[in-house]
């Protein structure tokens, strides 16, 4: 994450860097209006080969802005190959979640791999960042995500790295955890990396219930 909105004094602008390529989100009118000014500055600052516009976040609707995504500058291959620790991951900067990959979790992925053992479970796995790192030490890993395209990416990334001890399931994580608990199945290592369950004040109560449920069932 090269630019993190308010945290870097640039509210409404998020820029992630994957190797030679950038993904950018312009989330408020002030940044949207300055997009044509910002793009050449990003090119100059990061010496990148291409910039993908990922301004398709739902928060833009609250600002009266349409959702947009597509190439902003240069060229961006699909997928882009990134490296985390000793593993390679293919990610789509255009079609992946948010800016394509969750770079803020990169170090956590590697650390989880060091502590994994026995039978491991990765819930909300996305492209397998936690699952594939854990597979290097765990006996076997189950990766669960509700998105079939994401699960296809996990399988492809496992094959890319020669990893064969990962089972990938495209199913609802809540339903999966309930079924595992009911069946009495247990895991030695469990990772929960859920999306935001509460994106507005009205959703806070339901979001807290969701977080409580997955944590209780994981334990």
Show which residues each predicted segment covers.
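Non-catalytic substrate-recognition/targeting regions of SAM-dependent transferases
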Residues: 3-16, 32-101
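Rossmann-like S-adenosyl-L-methionine
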Residues: 74-219
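Carbohydrate-binding surface patches
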Residues: 21-26
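Short intrinsically disordered, low-complexity coil segments enriched in acidic
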Residues: 1-3, 219
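Short, flexible turn/loop "capping" segments at secondary-structure junctions
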Residues: 18-20, 135
């Amino acid at each position: 994450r090269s630019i993190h909105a308010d945290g870097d004094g640039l509210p409404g602008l998020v820029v992630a860097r994957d190797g030679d390529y950038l993904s950018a989100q312009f989330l408020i009118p002030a940044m949207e209006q300055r997009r044509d000014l910002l793009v050449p500055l990003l090119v100059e600052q990061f010496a990148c080969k291409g910039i993908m516009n990922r301004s398709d976040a739902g928060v833009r609707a609250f600002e009266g802005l349409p959702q947009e995504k597509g190439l902003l500058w240069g060229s961006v291959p699909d997928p882009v190959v990134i490296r985390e620790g000793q593993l390679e991951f293919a990610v789509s900067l255009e079609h992946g979640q948010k800016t394509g990959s969750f770079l803020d979790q990169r170090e956590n992925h590697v650390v989880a791999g060091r502590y994994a053992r026995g039978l491991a479970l990765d819930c909300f796995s996305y492209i397998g960042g936690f699952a594939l790192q854990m597979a290097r030490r765990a006996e076997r890993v189950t990766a669960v995500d509700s998105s079939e395209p994401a699960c296809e990416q996990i399988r492809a990334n496992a094959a890319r790295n020669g990893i064969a001890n990962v089972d990938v399931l495209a199913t609802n994580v809540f339903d999966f955890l309930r079924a595992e608990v009911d069946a009495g199945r247990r895991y030695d290592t469990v990772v929960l990396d859920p999306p935001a369950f509460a994106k507005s004040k009205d959703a806070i109560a339901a979001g807290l219930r969701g977080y409580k449920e997955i944590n209780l069932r994981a334990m």
